[in-house]
């Protein structure tokens, strides 16, 4: 799971999963892959884009800090950055270039996403 969320919701026709952090915490990769891009989105904040070998791309937006570099290999659960208390983490997923509902690929439990 990227973070322990106090609540979750979907945006943009379920192509973005929004997780609210109850406290400041580290954000983890949700799949194995390589960091393809880092940057800042004017609407969603700082982000990391992770590309996996099986045509999946994971986007993590809303980070208060980024701890990875472009080209860096990552394993599932590796630390990629952090999010502030009360901050929103926006999770996007592409499969073969098409937006998919990230909630379908992650186990959602109360307190854990």
Summary of predicted features, one role per range:
Residues 2, 38-39, 63-66, 83, ...:
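Residue-level recognition of beta-strand microenvironments
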Residues 4-10, 35, 41-42, 99:
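Active-site/binding-pocket entry motifs
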Residues 20, 26-30, 60-61, 71-74:
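Small beta-strand-rich domains/subdomains or short beta-sheet motifs embedded
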Residues 25-27, 33-36, 74-81:
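Generic structural signal for buried aliphatic residues
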Residues 30-64:
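Zn2+-dependent peptidoglycan hydrolase active-site motif and core
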Residues 49, 70-113:
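Conserved, short, structured surface segments that act as functional micro-motifs
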